[in-house]
């Protein structure tokens, strides 16, 4: 720390002039001046600020200044100095120091620039460092520098000599300021006099304020007061007389005088405060880590003073200016010695030469030992009551979080209070960083014990032990305060065989301990892999460095562009082989291999992905807890046969989860349908949308469930009451099982499940009335099943296994867990005999506390004063507080610990003797309490499977309630879809269909339409849809698919009637987008998506194709569109809506009898060149796309549109003639097309055309 950079503090900024406290008396302050070295008393001109009045009057003559000074001296006997002059700095210690000196002025002129007559000066080392190195106030620093320069030049010119001569003269003049210290009105008693020096020392370790004050690092948090480098704390109410502040109004600097109540002591020298440049390496406000401070200071203490030594007032370079930068941070290399530009550079590690390690202090060695292994991670390092970030991490905290930076050559630092760790860590994680948390593993008492056990102290043992306890990443968050998303948060690990297009994939939601595993045999377009990504939307990805193809990496970045997942490239050796993976999982699962994994052990790439995932979890310190509670499930992104398939392209084109405008959920199907009350219900509902049912009976059962809720309002009210205000029980029980939760979480979980149990009992009378088996299983307990024999059904892949088994009876388990502990005075106490060591420790504490209480009563009797009480102040606890008036009866052996004007506080011999024992027992209690908590939580984990089944039932109940709300609480007309079994071709017949997402915004303005495919009234299963641009074709296509998805989820649909067969899959080819990342053009994307349709579509599929062939030339595009249309109509025979601007496709002879035609109607104003879109579907073919009319409406210049009309007419005429010549249209059709083209043209042109036709073979 450089004193020259100190901020000049104006005392007045901390006080309102109308509120001033009464003076108080603090004893023992005089000794503070006695230890100050004489050689450190020389003034530092750089620290003397210039008041605004001085700055504006620098041109005044010295005689004017002398006159002002003489005038001032007549009003007071003291030499005046500037009211804004530098306040003496307190010694830099980890604790706070208060200077309880009463300042008053004898002048009658009021002022706002001096402090109240009584104030407390609290100096916090870290806050002082931060404030004096604050680069966010350049204007203020510049102004101060200008003031100092002006003052120096003014003094130099008046003295007629150089600055050095001036300094020599100035230092010989002793300050004439009369400083008086408040002393007790009564003589000190003998114990008080004996302990005066002790009090002086204690002032460096204690804060005499009644309320503890912590350093405020968070200077950007508006909820927390932003402390300056000094904090003046008013402790008493203002006095009407003695507290008024006065000063002389002169341009000569004034010095405050201190008016005593008793005879005063005038020191002959002023206090000097020393600063350690490495103080920020010490603990901040840390009563537990004093030894770290000592070690750091011994290792690298270079002390500078606020007042420079002789001859160093100007020009001397301090340590900060000459200190060299760590060499290993100048040329950064990884642990293997590879520089940053090396292809094998590992950004996770840092190479530190042995020569640097030997120069580190124990604390620095401790820090760099952890940081060098996690160099790509922002490390929060616990020091006392704060978490601190150093070096590059400090830069990130300063630049991205705007935290105040303590800038130094090495070990620059920012810090945050420990209570706000989650807040700042969450921000960094949201910005894409990984965050490491380093905690203190012992208290100062524990450290002392450890040192005593080792029989001494060495450098390694001289600091608090710290360990890296966790690494937080976007995909592995466990703390409920940091998980802001109620949907699942996934970490994905993949292992790829590029040659065979095979993937092994592992997804894990660590918040609930679920692993999803699958092997994908994909095609060239990686359609299944893309579908998997869109279904799961992982927040973080682990992939094998050098073994993952660029195409796969490109797909992940493109598909997940809205999520922006954290990408972790891992070395191949960090991917465990299948055998090693199975052995480690078996070991963590108590020697029992999960049955699901036994079935997958021969799938090499799947097990490789699982090994890579668990290896990563181990590295971030959560692998053991997650795997121990894990449930492994096989996952199939295309669950053929069990549910309707919605591939990735379908999820994107239909805007199921994210819209195409800004990537948000606004206007999506999920946003419309998700009415779930609980977080775990929302997670299940997302899976319901991804996998609509493909079983008629299951769909009908859901329909019956929501209809029962509609028809039974009393039951509906009770069901709603069960789910209302439930916390995220699924994640809470997972944390309890992992033993990472608080006892309050366990109590909350037990209370909620007990309340649910009571409410379910109220529904027993309605059991026989519910037709839906699904709803009945969610509401009623399966009393026929012995709860001790409930199978671990949550490990099953088929939800049907648990859907109809009934809600488990949890009452016996709740009572067993509750009996294992009690809560006494906010402390967790295990049942007696469960933890003998804890019982003994608690008994010792209670016995000691009782003896302390008895001792207090004895003191009250001795002093005959009931106001005597214990006072706990920071680390100094059990201080016996005695009013000053009663201290005459003070027994021998009492040691003074602190005092005020009204009371003194002591430690009696009894307290001194027994306090250490009490502190040791309490420290042991804290350690044992953690073990007790783990034991209690482990008792709950025994019954975890039963609670998980209950969560599944509640999730399903919440999803059914959401379907009910969408079906019967929407403003849109809804109907129950009727499903008809059909083993042949699929069909759909819908009346008055609307798009529910658009209708929710447009209301009754939305135009309904009918769709009929493969019905009695409309036998063809393929419809060719034409119409003008912007006529509503794409909307019709999407709403048809949305209706099918809603229907097969068991929900009502937005139509007046709906009859359909089960659809096995929906294919969509919508829009025209290129894929730059994959190197694919618009046409290539079209063909790839169309290829999947032709390859996988069946007679029961619904296919949506929009403007196929527009990505290439007209003739090539038409040819492809015709070929696909022909193949779908003759070979696949699936339900299909084929939207196109190629009207001629409807007349192709090979398909015209196999298709139906429809178009979106409109009204055309030829004169105004405008189109009024009617958005109503009609049978037939639209004669024109009216693209030029739309162009006119869009504002294109008239000249361009006229030219386009001429060219369009000629091209259309040529196209018709060519088609006639090649025999693709008949003579009558040719004439019809020509007449349509010329019906509003000049008659001469029509005659000219007739002559042309005569020359052709019209008999063709």
Curated annotation (Swiss-Prot):
Q: Which UniProt keywords apply?
A: ATP-binding, DNA damage, DNA repair, DNA-binding, Nucleotide-binding, Nucleus
**Care to name a GO molecular-function term for this sequence?**
mismatched DNA binding
Low complexity bias spans: 51-86, 133-148, 177-189, 234-266
Recorded superkingdom? Eukaryota
- Which Gene Ontology terms of cellular component type are present? MutSalpha complex; nucleus
Q: Where is the composition biased (Polar residues)?
A: 1-15, 101-123
The protein's predominant localisation is nucleus
Ranges of Acidic residues composition bias in the record: 24-43, 275-295
Q: Return the InterPro entries for the record.
A: DNA_mismatch_repair_MutS-lik_N, DNA_mismatch_repair_MutS/MSH, DNA_mismatch_repair_MutS_C, DNA_mismatch_repair_MutS_clamp, DNA_mismatch_repair_MutS_core, DNA_mismatch_repair_MutS_N, DNA_mismatch_repair_MutS_sf, DNA_mmatch_repair_MutS_con_dom
- Using the UniProt annotation, give all residue ranges assigned to the region (Disordered): 1-304
Under the heading SMART domains, the entry gives:
MUTSac, MUTSd
What is known about what this protein does?
Component of the post-replicative DNA mismatch repair system (MMR). Heterodimerizes with msh2 to form MutS alpha, which binds to DNA mismatches thereby initiating DNA repair. When bound, MutS alpha bends the DNA helix and recognizes single base mismatches and dinucleotide insertion-deletion loops (IDL) in the DNA. After mismatch binding, forms a ternary complex with the MutL alpha heterodimer, which is thought to be responsible for directing the downstream MMR events, including strand discrimination, excision, and resynthesis.
Its quaternary organisation is: Heterodimer consisting of msh2-msh6 (MutS alpha). Forms a ternary complex with MutL alpha (mlh1-pms1). Interacts with exo1.
Q: Which family does the record claim for this protein?
A: Belongs to the DNA mismatch repair MutS family.
Name of the protein = DNA mismatch repair protein Msh6
Q: Which gene encodes it?
A: msh6
């Amino acid at each position: 720390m450089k004193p020259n950079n100190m901020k000049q503090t104006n005392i007045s900024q901390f006080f309102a002039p109308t509120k001033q406290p009464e003076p108080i008396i603090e004893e023992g302050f005089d000794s503070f001046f006695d230890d100050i070295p004489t050689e450190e008393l020389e003034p530092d001109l750089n620290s003397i600020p210039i008041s605004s009045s001085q700055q504006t009057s620098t041109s005044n003559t010295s005689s004017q200044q002398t006159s002002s000074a003489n005038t001032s001296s007549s009003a007071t006997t003291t030499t005046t100095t500037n009211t804004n002059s530098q306040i003496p700095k307190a010694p830099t210690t980890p604790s706070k120091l208060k200077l309880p000196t009463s300042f008053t002025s004898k002048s009658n002129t009021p002022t706002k620039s001096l402090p109240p007559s009584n104030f407390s000066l609290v100096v916090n080392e870290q806050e002082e460092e931060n404030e004096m190195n604050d680069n966010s106030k350049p204007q203020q620093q510049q102004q101060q520098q200008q003031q100092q320069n002006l003052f120096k030049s003014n003094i130099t010119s008046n003295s007629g000599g150089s600055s050095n001569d001036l300094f020599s003269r100035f230092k010989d003049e002793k300050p004439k300021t009369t400083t008086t210290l408040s002393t007790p009105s009564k003589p000190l008693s003998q114990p008080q006099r004996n302990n005066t020096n002790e009090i002086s020392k204690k002032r460096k370790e204690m804060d005499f304020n009644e309320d503890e004050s912590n350093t405020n690092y968070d200077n950007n948090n508006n909820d927390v007061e932003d402390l300056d480098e000094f904090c003046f704390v008013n402790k008493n109410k203002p006095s009407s007389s003695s507290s008024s502040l006065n000063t002389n109004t002169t341009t000569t600097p004034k010095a405050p005088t201190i008016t005593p109540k008793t005879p005063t002591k005038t020191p002959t020298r002023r206090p000097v405060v020393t600063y350690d440049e490495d103080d920020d390496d010490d603990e901040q406000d840390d009563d537990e880590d004093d030894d770290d401070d000592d070690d750091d200071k011994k290792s690298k203490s270079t002390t500078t003073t606020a007042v420079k030594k002789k001859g160093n007032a100007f020009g001397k370079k301090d340590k900060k200016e000459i200190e060299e930068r760590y060499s290993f941070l100048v040329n950064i290399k990884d642990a293997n010695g590879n520089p940053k530009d090396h292809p094998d550079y590992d950004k996770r590690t840092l190479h530190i030469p042995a020569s640097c390690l030997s120069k580190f202090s124990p604390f620095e060695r401790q820090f760099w030992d952890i940081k060098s292994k996690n160099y790509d991670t922002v490390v929060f390092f616990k020091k006392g009551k704060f978490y601190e970030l150093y070096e590059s991490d400090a830069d990130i905290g300063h630049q991205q979080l705007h935290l105040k930076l303590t800038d130094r050559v090495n070990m620059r630092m920012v810090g945050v209070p420990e209570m706000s760790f989650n807040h700042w860590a969450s921000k960094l994680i949201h910005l894409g960083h990984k965050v490491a948390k380093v905690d203190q593993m012992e208290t100062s008492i524990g450290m002392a014990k450890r040192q005593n056990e080792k029989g001494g102290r060495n450098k390694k043992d001289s600091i608090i032990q710290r360990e890296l306890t966790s690494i937080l990443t976007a995909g592995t968050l466990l703390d409920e305060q940091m998980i802001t998303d109620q949907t699942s948060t996934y970490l994905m690990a993949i292992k790829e065989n590029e040659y065979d297009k095979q993937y092994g994939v592992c997804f894990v939601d660590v918040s609930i301990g679920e692993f999803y595993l699958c092997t994908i045999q994909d095609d060239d377009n990686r359609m299944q892999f893309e579908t998997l990504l869109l279904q799961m939307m992982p927040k973080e990805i682990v992939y094998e460095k050098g073994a993952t193809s660029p195409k796969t990496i490109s797909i992940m970045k493109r598909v997940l562009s809205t999520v922006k997942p954290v990408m972790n490239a891992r070395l191949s050796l960090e991917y465990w082989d299948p055998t090693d993976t199975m052995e480690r999982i078996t070991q963590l699962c108590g020697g029992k291999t999960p049955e699901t994994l036994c079935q997958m052990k021969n799938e090499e790439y799947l097990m490789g992905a699982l090994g890579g995932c668990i290896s990563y979890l181990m590295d971030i310190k959560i692998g053991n807890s997650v795997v121990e509670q894990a449930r492994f499930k096989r996952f199939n992104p295309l669950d053929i046969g069990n549910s309707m398939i919605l591939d990735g392209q379908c999820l994107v084109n239909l805007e199921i989860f994210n819209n195409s405008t800004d990537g948000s959920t606004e206007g999506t199907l999920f946003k419309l349908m998700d009415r779930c009350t609980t977080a775990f219900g929302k997670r299940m509902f997302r899976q319901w949308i991804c996998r609509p049912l493909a079983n008629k009976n299951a769909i009908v059962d859901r329909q019956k469930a929501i209809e029962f809720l509609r028809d039974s309002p009393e039951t509906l009210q009770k069901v709603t009451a069960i789910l209302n205000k439930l916390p995220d029980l699924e994640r809470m029980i997972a944390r309890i099982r992992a033993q990472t939760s608080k006892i309050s979480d366990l109590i909350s979980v037990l209370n909620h499940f007990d309340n649910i149990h009571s409410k379910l009992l109220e529904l027993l009378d309605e059991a026989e009335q519910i037709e839906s088996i699904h709803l009945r299983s969610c509401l009623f307990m399966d009393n026929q099943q012995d709860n001790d024999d409930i199978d671990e059904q949550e490990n099953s892949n088929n939800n049907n296994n648990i859907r109809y088994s009934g809600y488990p009876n949890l009452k016996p388990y709740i009572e067993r867990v509750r009996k294992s502990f009690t809560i006494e005075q906010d402390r967790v106490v295990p049942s007696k005999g469960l933890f003998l060591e804890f019982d003994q420790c608690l008994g010792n504490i209670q016995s000691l506390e009782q003896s302390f209480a008895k001792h207090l009563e004895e003191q009250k009797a001795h002093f005959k004063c009931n106001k005597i009480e214990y006072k706990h102040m920071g680390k100094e606890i059990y201080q016996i507080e005695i009013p000053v008036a009663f201290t005459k009866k003070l027994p021998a052996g009492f040691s003074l610990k602190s005092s005020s004007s009204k009371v003194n506080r002591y430690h009696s011999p009894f307290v001194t003797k027994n306090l250490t024992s009490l502190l040791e027992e309490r420290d042991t209690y804290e350690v044992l309490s953690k073990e007790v908590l783990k034991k209690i939580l482990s008792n709950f984990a025994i019954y975890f499977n039963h609670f998980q089944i209950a969560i599944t039932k509640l999730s399903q109940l919440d999803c059914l309630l959401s379907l009910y709300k969408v079906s019967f609480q929407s403003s849109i007309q809804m109907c129950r879809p009727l499903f008809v079994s059909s083993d042949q071709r699929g069909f759909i017949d819908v009346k008055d269909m609307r798009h529910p997402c658009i209708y929710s915004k447009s209301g009754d303005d939305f135009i309904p339409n009918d769709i009929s495919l493969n019905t009695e009234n409309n036998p063809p299963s393929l419809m060719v849809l034409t119409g003008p641009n912007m006529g509503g074709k794409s909307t019709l296509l999407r709403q048809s698919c949305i209706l099918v998805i809603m229907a097969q989820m068991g929900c009502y649909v937005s139509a007046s009637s709906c009859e359909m067969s089960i659809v096995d899959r929906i294919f969509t080819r919508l829009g025209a987008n290129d894929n730059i990342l994959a190197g694919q053009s618009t046409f290539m994307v079209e063909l790839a998506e169309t290829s999947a349709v032709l390859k996988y579509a069946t007679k029961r599929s619904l296919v949506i194709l929009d403007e196929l062939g527009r990505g290439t030339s007209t003739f090539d595009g038409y040819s492809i569109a015709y070929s696909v249309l022909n193949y779908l109509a003759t070979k696949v025979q699936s339900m299909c809506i084929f939207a196109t601007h190629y009207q001629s496709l409807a007349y192709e002879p090979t398909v015209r009898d196999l298709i139906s035609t429809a178009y979106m109607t409109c009204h055309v104003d030829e004169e105004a060149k405008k189109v009024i879109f009617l958005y109503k579907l009609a049978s037939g073919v639209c004669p024109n796309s009216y693209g030029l009319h739309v162009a006119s409406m869009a504002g294109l210049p008239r000249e361009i549109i006229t030219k386009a009309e001429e060219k369009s007419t000629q091209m259309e005429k040529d196209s018709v003639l060519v088609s006639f010549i090649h025999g693709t249209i008949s003579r009558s059709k040719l004439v019809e097309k020509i007449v349509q083209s010329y019906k509003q043209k000049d008659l001469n042109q029509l005659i000219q055309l007739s002559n042309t036709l005569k020359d052709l073979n019209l008999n063709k």
